[in-house]
């Protein structure tokens, strides 16, 4: 059984017991979080597709940890001008373990 849900402006395909990284959520590690924007649920041949969300669909997960991703370098370079600008960015994430899928 798997589901597709939306969190942080992105869609994630998850199965029960899977660990996934999401955009940062303000929930303490060890607590439970519920996602109700479920777009699709599949249980073998039984597939429910929402318009846009599945009615009564819910994905529950336990927050494992918070952290920051790898650094992404941003470089702006102007040729022949002796001008270069360099910056970096590390995005915050929340790692969750999927504990249940309900449809």
Curated annotation (Swiss-Prot):
S-S pairs: none
TM helices/strands, residue ranges: none
PROSITE patterns to which the protein is assigned, alphabetical: RIBOSOMAL_L21
A GO-annotated cellular component: cytoplasm
Keywords: Ribonucleoprotein, Ribosomal protein, RNA-binding, rRNA-binding
Record GO biological process: translation
One Gene Ontology term of the molecular function aspect: structural constituent of ribosome
Domain of life, per lineage: Bacteria
Function statement: This protein binds to 23S rRNA in the presence of protein L20.
Quaternary structure note: Part of the 50S ribosomal subunit. Contacts protein L20.
PANTHER family per record: 50S RIBOSOMAL PROTEIN L21 (PTHR21349), LARGE RIBOSOMAL SUBUNIT PROTEIN BL21M (PTHR21349:SF0)
Descriptive protein name: Large ribosomal subunit protein bL21
The species this protein was found in: Alteromonas mediterranea (strain DSM 17117 / CIP 110805 / LMG 28347 / Deep ecotype)
Gene of this entry: rplU1
């Amino acid at each position: 059984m798997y589901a597709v849900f939306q969190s942080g402006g992105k869609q994630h395909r998850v199965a029960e017991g899977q660990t996934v990284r999401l955009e940062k959520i303000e929930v303490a590690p060890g607590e439970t979080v519920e996602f109700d924007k479920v777009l699709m649920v599949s249980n073998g041949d039984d597939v429910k597709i929402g318009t846009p969300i599945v009615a009564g669909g819910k994905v529950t997960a336990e927050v494992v940890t918070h952290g920051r991703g790898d650094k992404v370098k941003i470089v702006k370079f102007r040729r022949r001008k002796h001008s270069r600008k360099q910056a970096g960015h590390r995005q915050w994430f929340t790692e969750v373990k999927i504990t249940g899928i309900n449809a």
